[in-house]
Structures are given as C-alpha cells and as structure tokens.
C-alpha cells in the first residue's frame, strides 16, 4: 500500500482537527438512523456498490487488506476503509492500494461538513 506524504513537522493528530470534531462518548446516539438519513441526503451513493464487510474479533485488518490486495491485483477497482489509524487520518482510506492524500481528504470532508453537522456524524461516520 502506498502511503501519502505527511509533513513530519505537522502534528498528525491535529491535521484535520478543524473538520473532524473530537469523539464524545457520553450521550451519543449510536443507532444507524443518523447515518441512514445522511446517506439518503446524498441520494444513497453506496446502494449499487458491491461490498465485502469483514467482521469478527481478531484479524479483520489483515483479512480486509488481503481482500483489497487481491481485488486490486485482479484489475478491479477496490477501496478499503480501516480504523483506527496510527499517525494520520489518511491511513483509513485506500483505493487501489493508494492511500488518500491529505489535501483530497480535507477537500471531501469540507464538502461534507454541513451534512456531518446536520446529522451529528461521529468521526468514524464522516470517514466512511
């Protein structure tokens, strides 16, 4: 997987702090309704996209990366989202083995900011 260049002088924790609010656990609504409403406002962009969801206790990241690598090697356009990240929010999103660039992630988060605020999306939901 190719990693985007991160400025070593920049604080990676704060690189998107103005667009991704801190995670607050108390009183948080963790139901799917908020995300379903947000997706409906976007005309359900994922409705016709084939997807593989990897769930379980251990090994999810490894299995998801292997599936992503296999699909990309087979010539299929493949995306991967993972959580958590180690040093940069960009680590969470890859398409065809290419990590999203910080500028591109910032632009997309900025475009979706009104929707994220309207539906009170969590940081994880904003990155999906």
PLM regions with names:
Residues 7-8, 32, 36-47, 73-128:
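ATP-dependent carboxylate-amine ligase catalytic core
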Residues 1-50:
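Positively charged, low-complexity intrinsically disordered leader regions
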Residues 60-64, 87-90:
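Short active-site-adjacent helix-start/loop capping segments
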